[in-house]
C-alpha cells in the first residue's frame, strides 16, 4: 500500500470526462495496481479511481526537458507537464483506454506499507445462509437459471455463486445482507476477471442482497450489474411474501 499526500490536479478521460482542480489530496495505490484519489471528507468514497487491471506510468517534467532533442516540443504528447509548477504526471490506464491523468505539483508525504495478504471479509451467518438458500432456489434470479457452483474460486477470492442464465451465458452472483458500494466494487472485479476466461465469457453480474443502498444500486446499474432484493424470511419458508426483483 502506497499513500501519497500531494497537491494535485486530476483528469479522467474515458466514457465521460471529469476534472479535479488543484488541491491537496490523498493518492492511494494498492498492491493490485488500483489507484484512488481521496479528499478529507466523503467517508471512504474516493473522488475518482481506477480499478485493476491497470498500469501507472510516471513522467517527470525535468526528464522530459532533458530528453528533448532537435528543437522538438517536449510537451507535445504530455501537455500537462508544460506548467512549470508541475513536478510529475501520472498516467493510470486500463485495457479499455480509460485514463486517470494526475498532475503532481508538490508531494508532502510518500509512504509505503506492506500489509501482507488479507484473510478477506468473513460472511456473517445470514449471508452464508442466503448463499445456501439462493443456490437451492436459483430460479429466484430468473426462469431458466441453473447453478454452476457455490464459492467459485478465482485468484482474487471466491465468487459467491456462479450460474448460467436461460441462454447459457455465465452470471456471477455476489450476495450481501446489506448491499453497499464495496460489494458492487467486489463484484465488478470478479466480472472483469472472469471475462478474461474464454470458456466463461461473456460474464455478467447480479448483486443480490436483503437491502441495497441507493448509491450501490446506482453504481451497479451504471456498470451493467443487475440488482436483486432477497426476502430472507420467504426463502426460509417462514413468510408467504413474493420475492422482489428490481
From Swiss-Prot:
Family, as annotated: Belongs to the NucS endonuclease family.
Keyword Nucleus assigned: no
Subcellular location as annotated: Cytoplasm
Keywords: Cytoplasm, DNA-binding, Endonuclease, Hydrolase, Nuclease
EC number: 3.1.-.-
Major localisation: cytoplasm
GO molecular function (one): single-stranded DNA endodeoxyribonuclease activity
Protein's UniProt keywords contain DNA-binding: yes
Protein name: Endonuclease NucS
Superkingdom field: Bacteria
CDD domains on file: NucS-like
Gene3D superfamilies: 2.70.180.20, 3.40.1350.10
Alphabetical list of InterPro entries matching this protein: Endonuclease_NucS, NucS_C, NucS_N, NucS_N_sf, tRNA_endonuc-like_dom_sf
Species: Corynebacterium urealyticum (strain ATCC 43042 / DSM 7109)
Purpose of the protein: Cleaves both 3' and 5' ssDNA extremities of branched DNA structures.
Any one annotated GO CC term: cytoplasm
Amino acid at each position: 500500500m502506497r499513500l501519497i499526500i500531494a497537491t494535485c490536479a486530476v483528469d479522467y478521460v474515458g466514457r465521460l470526462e471529469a476534472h479535479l482542480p488543484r488541491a491537496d489530496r490523498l493518492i492511494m495505490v494498492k498492491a493490485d495496481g488500483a489507484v484512488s484519489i481521496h479528499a478529507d471528507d466523503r467517508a471512504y468514497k474516493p473522488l475518482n479511481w481506477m480499478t485493476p487491471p491497470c498500469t501507472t506510468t510516471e513522467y517527470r517534467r525535468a526528464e522530459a526537458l532533458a530528453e528533448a532533442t532537435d528543437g522538438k516540443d517536449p510537451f507535445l504528447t504530455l501537455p500537462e507537464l508544460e506548467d512549470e509548477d508541475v513536478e510529475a504526471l501520472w498516467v493510470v490506464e486500463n485495457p479499455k483506454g480509460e485514463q486517470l491523468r494526475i498532475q503532481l505539483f508538490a508531494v508532502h508525504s510518500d509512504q509505503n506499507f506492506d500489509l501482507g495478504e488479507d484473510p478477506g471479509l468473513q460472511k456473517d451467518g445470514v449471508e452464508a445462509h442466503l448463499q445456501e438458500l439462493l443456490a437451492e432456489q436459483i430460479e429466484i434470479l430468473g426462469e431458466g437459471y441453473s447453478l454452476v457452483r457455490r464459492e467459485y474460486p478465482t485468484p482474487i477470492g471466491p465468487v459467491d455463486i456462479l450460474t448460467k442464465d436461460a441462454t447459457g451465458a455465465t452470471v456471477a452472483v455476489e450476495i450481501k445482507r446489506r448491499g453497499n458500494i464495496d460489494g458492487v466494487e467486489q463484484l465488478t472485479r470478479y466480472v472483469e476477471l472472469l471475462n478474461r476466461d474464454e470458456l466463461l465469457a461473456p460474464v455478467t453480474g447480479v448483486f443480490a442482497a436483503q437491502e441495497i443502498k441507493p448509491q450501490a444500486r446506482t453504481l451497479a446499474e451504471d456498470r451493467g450489474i443487475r440488482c436483486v432484493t432477497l426476502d430472507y424470511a420467504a426463502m426460509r419458508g417462514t413468510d408467504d411474501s413474493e420475492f422482489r426483483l428490481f
